[in-house]
Each structure stands twice: as structure tokens, then as C-alpha cells.
Curated annotation (Swiss-Prot):
Name of the protein: SAGA complex subunit SGF11
Family annotation (Gene3D superfamilies): 1.10.287.210, Classic Zinc Finger
S-S bonds: none
Annotated organism of origin: Saccharomyces cerevisiae (strain ATCC 204508 / S288c) (Baker's yeast)
Record remark on domains: The long N-terminal helix forms part of the 'assembly lobe' of the SAGA deubiquitination module.
Subcellular localization(s) per the UniProt record: Nucleus
Stated role: Component of the transcription coactivator SAGA complex. SAGA acts as a general cofactor required for essentially all RNA polymerase II transcription. At the promoters, SAGA is required for transcription pre-initiation complex (PIC) recruitment. It influences RNA polymerase II transcriptional activity through different activities such as TBP interaction (via core/TAF module) and promoter selectivity, interaction with transcription activators (via Tra1/SPT module), and chromatin modification through histone acetylation (via HAT module) and deubiquitination (via DUB module).
Length: 99
């Protein structure tokens, strides 16, 4: 009979493996329960679309360029490009405070 020498390293590896296994099992159980609940509540639920090229959004539709979207500023009444909205609002709202 050969006995395995018990070292601190082997004990710590065993504890780590037990902790990781327990954590993984807990996460899998929670996610499985959540998926079953979602399928029960929303039977027609579709999962998000994944496009490896990055040209489609999560619904499988063509992405719109941010510069093609315009937002109406209620403060000054101008249409501002979506990618410039934050800078516009900062300028637009600070002008109103000076008056």
C-alpha cells in the first residue's frame, strides 16, 4: 500500500477545487432556473441575435449610423446630431444660465 503524502499544497488544491465546483454548480442551477422561468412567462421569447461581423444589432437588423440620427433640442429648437448632443446640451444650457 502506498500512501499519498498529504501536503499543504495538496490540501489547498482540494479546497480550491471544491469551492470552484460548488460555485459553478450554483451558477448553473440559478441560470437554469431563470431560463425555465423566462420560458414559462414568455413562451415566444427569442434570444438575441449575434453577428460576428458586427454589422447587425441584437435584433438582427442593420445598425444605423449615429450621425444619421437627429434629436430635437427642446431648449433652442434645433435638430442636433446624436453624436454631438452632449456637447450641444452643455453649450445650450449654459447659455441660458448666463441670461
Amino acid at each position: 500500500m502506498t500512501e499519498e503524502t498529504i501536503t499543504i499544497d495538496s490540501i489547498s488544491n482540494g479546497i480550491l477545487n471544491n469551492l470552484l465546483t460548488t460555485l459553478i454548480q450554483d451558477i448553473v442551477a440559478r441560470e437554469t432556473t431563470q431560463q425555465q422561468l423566462l420560458k414559462t412567462r414568455y413562451p415566444d421569447l427569442r434570444s438575441y441575435y449575434f453577428d460576428p461581423n458586427g454589422s447587425l444589432d441584437i435584433n438582427g437588423l442593420q445598425k444605423q449610423q449615429e450621425s444619421s440620427q437627429y434629436i430635437h433640442c427642446e431648449n433652442c429648437g434645433r435638430d442636433v446630431s446624436a453624436n454631438r448632443l452632449a456637447a450641444h446640451l452643455q453649450r445650450c444650457l449654459s447659455r441660458g444660465a448666463r441670461r
